[in-house]
Amino acid sequence: MMPFSVLQVKRLQLELITPAKPTLQEAKFLSDIDDQEGLRFQVPVIMCYKDNPSLNKNCNPVKVIREALSRALVYYYPLAGRLKEGPNRKLMVDCNGEGILFVEASADVTLEQLGDKILPPCPLLEEFLFNFPGSDGIIGCPLLLVQVTCLTCGGFILALRVNHTMCDAPGLLLFLTAIAEMARGAHAPSILPVWERELLFSRDPPRITCAHHEYEDVIDHSDGLYASSNQSNMVQRSFYFGAKEMRVLRKQIPPHLISTCSTFDLITACLWKCRTLALNINPKEAVRVSCIVNARGKHNNVRLPLGYYGNAFAFPAAISKAEPLCKNPLGYALELVKKAKATMNEEYLRSVADLLVLRGRPQYSSTGSYLIVSDNTRAGFGDVNFGWGQPVFAGPAKALDLISFYVQHKNNTEDGILVPMCLPSSAMERFQQELERITQEPKEDICNNLRSTRIMSMM
């Protein structure tokens, strides 16, 4: 494994990539889902590719991606603009064509030497996605930063940071797919982008018709452990859920839930319970977990165009007092998670938009008693092919304070799910202990299974 002190990343001068052709100069309003306070942050994504001379012999990934970016921005030209804030904090994009930030870099390391260090939480993220001073604001700053780092093995790492108000994971995937298609020679994206953010404006008059526990103001009762403002107190680790862990968890679920619960539901219930125990929250206080639910598709009955790349999700919250969550079997948490997810439909999303307008675009709750989880295992980042084949890893680079992203991961030959978590250092050790306990195989099963029962964590 390459020691951190040895790794050297050399960056060339930062540049602005503008659309390859002139684009409309106009102002475009974001939706009332887009511009909520809780989405006014940057999301880092990392994508790692092996050298593949049989597919792209003698091609320079920096040159190919730079040119494809410029061509894709002709279609996604709002991403080359800058955000402005209007009356009542309403966000709009000044489509001025100023461009996105791009930097070419090289590192004296191979992909093999990096090993698990490319997985979330990526400890080398600051090297592969340098935070240029003044570039990470929300208003008046570039909406996208892309760094392409060439490795000595011929592979490369594409890391990016996107302003979340502009798009969610499916929306970002549409943009990345367009870049990839053009990198492979296409003249236009196979799915043309659609702005139409007015489709998710609030109703007239706005009216809150659903319960939204995710936006409730609450006092932090996590025993003083959780202070998100003190980032030096926070640590990140990732935890792996493979076949063994899922088998043990499923054995704890009542029969009437087994056939209807997903892997995502079960992991979420497990994390919620273990995290609450680790934070030592007052037993009488309410704790919540939110599952990000995509509004696209027929299931939730929200009719959006195929190329819509704005934020189209809500995160309904399951809520419980800490004591029953910690003391009851896992099925208790699982039922609450499933019920919360089931509340998501078009009416729920419309009610969210109305709430955000009526209450001044509030932040979701930001106390330690709240957890937000997002399933990125089927997001499609692993299918983005710039001409070098599929990435060996692609997805969110780390957890973001209260938010954890589930990503696919192959541990040796087994497919599983990797979950990065962010917790105070004192709570992280307790969290790992609780997770190991709840995924521990019974003694009678261990005799039949020689695999380690210790859940794998990655620093």
From Swiss-Prot:
Return the broad EC class: transferase
- What keywords does the record list, in alphabetical order? Transferase
UniProt source species: Malus domestica
Transferase among the record's keywords? yes
- Its name, as the record gives it, is Alcohol acyl transferase 2
What is this protein's expression induced by? Slightly induced by ethylene.
Q: What's its job?
A: Involved in the biosynthesis of volatile esters which confer ripe apple fruit flavor. Alcohol acyl transferase that can use a wide range of alcohols as substrate to produce esters.
Family to which this protein belongs: Belongs to the plant acyltransferase family.
Q: Name one GO molecular function term.
A: acyltransferase activity
Q: Which domain of life is it from?
A: Eukaryota
Query: What is this protein's tissue specificity according to the annotation?
Result: Highly expressed in the cortex and skin of ripe fruit.
Per the UniProt record, the lineage of the source organism begins with:
Eukaryota, Viridiplantae, Streptophyta, Embryophyta, Tracheophyta
Q: What is its EC number?
A: 2.3.1.-
The GO annotation for biological process reads:
alcohol metabolic process; fruit ripening, climacteric; response to ethylene
Q: Which InterPro entries match?
A: CAT-like_dom_sf, Plant_acyltransferase
Active-site residues, Swiss-Prot/TrEMBL: H164 (proton acceptor), N385 (proton acceptor)
